[in-house]
Amino acid sequence: MADKLVKATAKNGDVRIIAAITTDMVNEGVKTHKCAPTAAAALGRMLTAGVLMGAQLKAESDSITLKINGGGIAKSVTVTSYSDAHVKGYIANPNADLPVNSQGKLDVGGIIGKNGNLLVIRDMGLKEPYVGQVPIYTGEIGDDIAYYYVNSEQTPSAVGLGVLVDKDLSIKASGGFIIQMMPGADDLVADLITYRLQEIPSITDLIAKGMSVEDILEFIFEDMDLKILDEGIVPEYRCDCSRDRVEKALISIGMKDLKEIYDDGKQEEVVCNFCNKKYVFTNDEVGSLIKRLENNK
């Protein structure tokens, strides 16, 4: 089933929903970083969480960055997403892998670890970005996002994230949802949704069966006044790096470090963490950056 993100409500607007199929998007990210199976599941869940949370942003230029580091062998996983559903991300150790857990599933919590924090940075073009941080709850990512919403934004939320990795390391199915109760919503509605989520198959099973994102929501919210609010948008893995941005990043390291690079007499290679694109600066070009920095004093 094709990738798609939709927004919806249920129970006369008491329930807010964002849901997406992200199979192709996650496949692109995992392929870019050549991930081992468990690393692929971890990165895929984070990319899906990012694109779902990014859909809540208002302005086109707004962005949200998620970073999780629990002291496990994955080290850290970072994603940045935008309101138009494009996302980029990387896992510091793409080779992180463990045997399946006791439920027979990829041990994402095991490679993430629990000794650390989930960081959420919202950049809305203000002087300072909004930064929220919570301790890692389970390391399974979906639980940690839900824990963040309750503790940092006081919004009770159910977060489901799933990535099914095939034998050839491609992504067979990926998707997720964020379900949030609005202020004043009946507690019985929350109980009903919790019960249904416990009873239904995983989101990856539903996607693998060929269900669309609308089909999945109709299945979960049957007889609950589900309203799909838009035609949906296509999530996309896309890096927006450029030589100009890399130049600015090099300049930002400061005169002292730039002069050390220049005095070495070698070219400088910078690799983008998000897409692995290489940017090469000759020694003369590094010298030009130093001159530009001197002229801006």
Curated annotation (Swiss-Prot):
Pfam entry (one): HSP33
Taxonomy, superkingdom: Bacteria
Similarity annotation: Belongs to the HSP33 family.
Lineage: Bacteria, Bacillati, Bacillota, Clostridia, Eubacteriales
UniProt-annotated location(s): Cytoplasm
Flavoprotein found in the keyword field: no
Keywords: Chaperone, Cytoplasm, Disulfide bond, Redox-active center, Zinc
PTM comment, free text: Under oxidizing conditions two disulfide bonds are formed involving the reactive cysteines. Under reducing conditions zinc is bound to the reactive cysteines and the protein is inactive.
Entries under InterPro entries matching the protein: Heat_shock_Hsp33, Heat_shock_Hsp33_C, Heat_shock_Hsp33_N
UniProt key word Cytoplasm: yes
Protein name: 33 kDa chaperonin
Alphabetical list of CDD domains matching this protein: Hsp33
UniProt GO BP: protein refolding
Disulfide-linked positions: 239-241, 272-275
Function comment: Redox regulated molecular chaperone. Protects both thermally unfolding and oxidatively damaged proteins from irreversible aggregation. Plays an important role in the bacterial defense system toward oxidative stress.
GO CC, one annotated term: cytoplasm
HAMAP family according to UniProt: HslO
A GO molecular-function descriptor: protein folding chaperone
Major site of localization recorded for this protein: cytoplasm
Membrane-traversing stretches: none
